[in-house]
């Protein structure tokens, strides 16, 4: 059997606030092969890590990351109070990509990364790729985006390892030829659409499988990588494959 890669979603976000160094460190400590994170550029062109452009959901503050300087972003508290209460209040901050790469360098230099480009500009890609190459980790990255133009730019300029999504989920979709792999969410994996997209012959990343039943379904469907918010069931099954 080909290796099944295990990936933590936004770190290990079932345990710690998503896209924080605590969450990434938890994923590393749990032993996943990779973890996924989301990149935006600050107003002063620093790549920072958060899923939403508006920090309201995880930080409780309305705004737009691209309109905030790094100094302003560092004042946010991404403790995700709605999910975790006060457990992490004052203990986390919005990390930069460089801070994440320093963590990986110190804790797990061979870590693989799922790099989700959230801001659909070539500048965002260029700045992120330059930093990943500086740390010698570019060749251990998958690059994700819900935008066909960005996927194609990554492939044509950098020959990056790309993963896009089904056509109906993409912005600016222009074909699958720039995809190395395809990302299928759980509702697709559980539907007859899964067979349709698997027939395209692309290795499939399936997400997010947080129960043993969902993990096994993804394996049975032929996943090459499975992403989980809670990697524990995934890791338990993967170790016995």
Language-model segments: residues:
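Phosphate-group recognition and catalysis centered on beta-loop-alpha active-site segments
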Residues: 1-241
